Amino acid sequence: MQQKFRMFLYIIRPIGIRVKICDYVNQNTAHSHGIDLSERMVLEMSVITKAGLLALAAVLLLPSAQTTQAAQPEPLIVIVQKRQDAQERTLRVLRDGSVEEAALDTYLAQVVLSEMPASFAPEALKAQAVAARTFACRQTAGGKHENADVCAQSACCQACLTVEDLRARYGDGFEAAWDKALAAVRETQNEVLTYEGALIDAVYFSCSGGSTEDAAAVWGTDVPYLRAVESPGEQDAAKYESRVCVTAETFAETLRALDASVQLSGDPSGWVQSVTRTPGGGVDTLTAGDRSFSGVQLRKAFGLNSTRFTLLYEDGAFSFDVLGYGHRVGMSQYGADAIARLGFDYRTILRFYYRGAELTTLDF
């Protein structure tokens, strides 16, 4: 939301003004400008706060001594500077081998736009902001990176595209997208998720294919607030369904790369002996020949979008029909959007996906 304030400053004696114009979002410094006021003048200024910035626009109204016509406004100064919050927190972000310092709100807005489409419902964006803040605070406390609090890689921490990359992604819609993301961050200011007083591991993913997964089924460690839950309404996700097909020869070679001792002989239609499933409907183990493989192993080996798949052999090829995209643990982003569009708020979304977790406001 844009807030605008108007003020008038009357100058009654000579004075000099020098202004330094800076763009703190892109960390660039422009030029310094000066002007002398040597007679009675009126300086009309508008102060606008938008997208984490404070902008001061000034127009100089010059008196007319030679004519009775009204003086014409002349643009004088535009100042863009970083808004100073009383308790603004920063963190160190590792990006491409270099560490940069970023305001927490700016970093979180970048994460929200990097991880979730700006077209999602506002309450879904707020849920993403809280999850991202919780994840970042937990990573910071954990000391995973020697000289940084977090990194910008989704495979390690959270995706955090630069402002320039986000502009390229959203094009003419960047300003509107940025406003939505920053609003989501600021309307959940300092809120995090905790369980028994400690920050939770607020993991999230794209879409579940109908159900999220127990953490133990994916990572082997039981986490009480990361349980399998039904997550309907995700069918509009681009990667809700997918298929991977491989020849019988490639199927056998891939399994042998996982376990060289696996014995596969005879008709390929009989290679797969059994499949067991997790609480969230994913593949727990698949037994082929005389060996068993985990769903996590198979997902990685065959490049599947998730572990929730069925396997069919037909006409000399194996087909993996896959539902969902991601590890399927924690919050489904498309599920969050579906819940938000039903009229529920971000608090409900977070409590639905992180069972037993509580919203806590940190005192930064």
Tell where the protein language model's regions lie, with residue ranges:
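Conserved, single-site charged/polar hotspot
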Residues: 5-364
